[in-house]
């Protein structure tokens, strides 16, 4: 749990960098911080957290449905909690379950266990499940201490894979050839039923931190 606390702080920092500090301080966006794990949820129930996520997504959705919804090899709104438990058990991956079994956080996940192009083990993968049926609605990864070269190569590969599935992003800033992580890199997609964010930046004491997030944005999935 202590490790997940620093993940919360890192995830919040990356969210602010990629989504914009101004947006995160709008009243309607405050629940977004909860969804991203950037602020504590206290004693909020799983249903209350899900409602906060639903409100936040209203400001993030695009207008058109996504041509695909890549999610690191999982299927949004189809993959179940039991499916992910089985995936983790088959690979001897340690996971913690919380929030009334709507949050599963797995640690030290090999990149080849996921459809991810990150070039080193992933520190933590968080799976969020819909309250009513425990189906997957959000998968987020966080990897710290990535070398500039590996981060740039990983980022380019992830961006290329998303572009192949989804086309041009809504917004992006790819790492330049000589990149040290001080200027954040990001790729952002916004659809009526799907949101994807990939980001990388240098953070004090953690080196370059990479984050991938793939989320259902449909009314049924949010």
Q: Model-predicted segments: where are they?
A:
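Non-cytosolic coordination micro-motifs
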Residues: 5-9, 17-104, 138-222
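N-terminal post-signal-peptidase region of extra-cytosolic proteins
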Residues: 67-70, 107-116, 122-124
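Hydrophobic/aromatic beta-strand elements that line small-molecule binding cavities or substrate pockets
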Residues: 125-130, 196-200
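Generic detector of bulky aromatic hydrophobic side chains
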Residues: 127-130, 135, 151-154
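Extracytoplasmic
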Residues: 122-126, 134-136, 184
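N-terminal secretory signal peptides that target proteins for export/translocation
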Residues: 1-2
């Amino acid at each position: 749990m202590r490790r997940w606390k620093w993940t919360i702080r890192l995830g919040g920092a990356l969210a602010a960098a990629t989504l914009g500090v101004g947006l995160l301080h709008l009243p309607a966006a405050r629940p977004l911080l909860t969804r991203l794990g950037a602020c504590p949820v206290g004693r909020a129930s799983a249903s209350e957290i899900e409602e906060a996520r639903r409100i936040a997504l209203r400001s993030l959705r695009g207008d058109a449905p996504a041509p695909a919804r890549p999610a690191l090899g999982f299927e949004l709104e189809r993959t179940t909690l039991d499916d992910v438990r089985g995936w983790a058990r088959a690979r001897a991956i340690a996971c913690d379950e919380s929030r009334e079994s709507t949050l599963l956080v797995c640690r030290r996940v090999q990149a080849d266990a996921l459809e991810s192009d990150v070039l080193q083990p992933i520190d933590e993968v968080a799976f969020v499940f819909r309250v009513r049926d425990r189906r997957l609605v959000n998968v987020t990864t966080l990897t710290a201490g990535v070398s500039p070269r590996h981060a740039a190569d990983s980022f380019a590969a992830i961006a290329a894979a998303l572009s192949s599935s989804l086309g041009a992003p809504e917004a992006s800033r790819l790492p330049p050839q000589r990149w040290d992580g001080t200027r954040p890199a990001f790729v952002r997609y916004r659809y009526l039923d799907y949101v994807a964010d990939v980001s990388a930046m240098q953070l004090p004491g953690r080196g370059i931190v990479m984050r991938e997030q793939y989320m259902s944005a449909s009314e049924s999935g949010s």
